[in-house]
Amino acid sequence: MKFELFREVALTRDFPEHQLRAGDVATLVDFVPHPSGGENGCVLEISNAVGKTIAVITAPLSAIEPLGPNEILTVRSLAPTANVPA
């Protein structure tokens, strides 16, 4: 599947180290080639409900999917951590 930069995508798996869950929405900001020919990756920016960036992560391309026209966004709480700016 071909993804476009700066489009919103959904995570297909959890990233517990960042308190992110499958279904969370992220913005695709860059592509990252695998250094030894494995699965390529991407850089994702995750924002809170008011648009403030709370994380920037790298993930394999298989960990994202495009948003679909039959999907709606939901809101969930993110427990505060030392990595999340107030």
Language model features by range: what are they?
Residues 3-67, 72-75, 79-80, 86:
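Basic/aromatic-rich interaction segments and small domains that mediate binding to polyanionic partners
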